Amino acid sequence: MKIVFAGTPEFAAQAMRAIHAAGHEIVLALTQPDRRAGRGMHLQASPVKEFALEKNIPVLQPETLRRNNKDPEKQQQAEDAYRALINTNFDAMVVVAYGLILPQEILDITQQAPRFGSFNIHASLLPRWRGAAPIQRAIEAGDAKTGVCIMQMEAGLDTGDVVLTADLAIASDETSSSLHDRLAALGAGLIVDALSLLQDGKGLSRTPQPALGVTYAEKILKAEADLDWSLSAREIDARIRAFNPFPGAISNLNAETIKLWKSRLADEDAYSEAGPIGAVIGFSEDGVFVRCGDGVIEILEAQKPGGKKMNAKTCLQSVDAPEKLLCFQTKA
């Protein structure tokens, strides 16, 4: 099949590579413009663009797909993308973490017979966690499972009919980083399955999303990273794992902002020492035990400003503390 692919990050690039490896021809790639990143703030291409260039796939990088934009340059970019889609011979469009809204006129192009339409890979079990950050929000909420849906796209935010789905369990030590990688692999395989069914003439059964159970995964804000130690140990552990790798959970410890990367729930009975909320009440071989609003958490990996990630015990023992009292400041 001939595919137009729209996506930007590594999650999308993995699906793109799988589609290519399955023998489908990607005839056009849409991705976000190059962005400045890294310590040198150099312009960097997206993983999708890098793969497209490697395979000599034409690439467009409009800042918007809305042709009614008031900025003449952006309007021209949108016009060029619109014309490219009209003039490209393709069977279906696959959209994965693209980062731009597809106007209805773009969706209409993909639905013109004999085309099959646009399909989106979404990293949740819809209708739970529609929106920008389904992986992080699933971990933060303490969900026991999540998965991937292949959705027939429409104008609403992740509201289209689901055509294929696959789920997996969320491990107790799961981080957003590890869950991202597992879901990327799951989604890549699932979109290949969907395209194979279309190619073989078997079609895809469309299941409308139920009205009940809708939740929204709002974009993660850096301000959320500041931990509130009055929460339960279970909630704090979930946030530390959800915010790894971005934005990284933080907390002030004796006037130093510490990033907390890895944690687990502790046996409170074994560490029942008294102490205020946020206090370090004990040490393990590699970690430290911190009193929470309800329960105790073991911090296993931490990072001081300008330093490297290291086991939490080594990291925190180097913090200057009067009378060796280590106490995280709870969020106001």
UniProtKB/Swiss-Prot annotation:
Keywords, A to Z, come to: Protein biosynthesis, Transferase
What EC number(s) does its UniProt record assign?
Answer: 2.1.2.9
An example of a Pfam family matching this protein is Formyl_trans_N
Q: Which organism encodes this protein? A: Polynucleobacter asymbioticus (strain DSM 18221 / CIP 109841 / QLW-P1DMWA-1) (Polynucleobacter necessarius subsp. asymbioticus)
Role this protein plays: Attaches a formyl group to the free amino group of methionyl-tRNA(fMet). The formyl group appears to play a dual role in the initiator identity of N-formylmethionyl-tRNA by promoting its recognition by IF2 and preventing the misappropriation of this tRNA by the elongation apparatus.
Q: What molecular functions are annotated in GO for this chain?
A: methionyl-tRNA formyltransferase activity
Which reaction(s) does the protein catalyse, per the Swiss-Prot or TrEMBL entry? L-methionyl-tRNA(fMet) + (6R)-10-formyltetrahydrofolate = N-formyl-L-methionyl-tRNA(fMet) + (6S)-5,6,7,8-tetrahydrofolate + H(+)
SUPFAM superfamilies xrefs: FMT C-terminal domain-like, Formyltransferase
- Name the UniProt record assigns to this protein: Methionyl-tRNA formyltransferase
Answer whether the UniProt record assigns the keyword Lyase to this protein.
no
The residues the record assigns to binding (6S)-5,6,7,8-tetrahydrofolate are 124-127
Q: What is the lineage of its organism?
A: Bacteria, Pseudomonadati, Pseudomonadota, Betaproteobacteria, Burkholderiales
Identify the InterPro entries for this entry. Fmt, Formyl_trans_C, Formyl_transf_N, Formyl_transf_N_sf, Formyl_transferase-like_C_sf, GART_AS, Met-tRNA-FMT_C, Met-tRNA-FMT_N
Highest taxon of source: Bacteria
Q: State the family it belongs to.
A: Belongs to the Fmt family.
Which is a Gene Ontology cellular component entry for this protein? cytosol
Q: Which residue ranges traverse the bilayer?
A: none
